[in-house]
């Protein structure tokens, strides 16, 4: 018999004692528009309609670590997601969003450490 229980260290059977008996899987909506403000409005609308998590779509310059005004970002800013260059962009992105009550996912690779260090 396995002595490990869900919700107890070492969490091999899950971090919640009731796991998904009490709460459903979190499904996040992947979205990002041409600006932090537009993306924020979309996120607020999604939350209003029952979404319990957000997955942020970043534009290509952001994904590879370029600021929006970098010459290599020309023509790509905001085309396939939200551009983030400074912490103010993130603050506008999450304005009025109850981040303590939802889960977020940031699908980004190369610049992951930069954004998580800003949050610390």
Which sequence ranges carry the predicted segments?
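Acidic/polar, glycine-rich intrinsically disordered N-terminal extensions of enzymes
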Residues: 1-88, 93-100
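Gly/Ser/Thr-rich loops at beta-strand to alpha-helix junctions
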Residues: 61, 109-114
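A short, small-residue-rich loop immediately preceding and capping a beta-strand
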Residues: 102-109
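Conserved small/polar residues in nucleotide/adenosyl-binding loops
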Residues: 115-120
């Amino acid at each position: 018999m396995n002595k490990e229980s869900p919700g107890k260290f070492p969490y091999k059977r899950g971090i919640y004692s009731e796991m998904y008996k009490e709460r459903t899987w979190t499904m996040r909506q992947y979205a990002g528009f041409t600006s932090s403000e537009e993306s924020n409005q979309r996120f607020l609308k999604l939350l209003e309609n029952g979404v319990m998590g957000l997955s942020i779509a970043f534009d290509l310059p952001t994904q590879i670590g370029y600021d929006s005004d970098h010459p290599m970002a020309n023509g790509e800013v905001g085309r396939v997601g939200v551009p983030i260059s400074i912490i103010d962009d993130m603050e506008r992105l999450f304005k009025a969003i109850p981040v303590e009550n939802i889960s977020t996912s940031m699908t980004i690779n190369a610049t992951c450490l930069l954004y998580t260090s800003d949050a610390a």
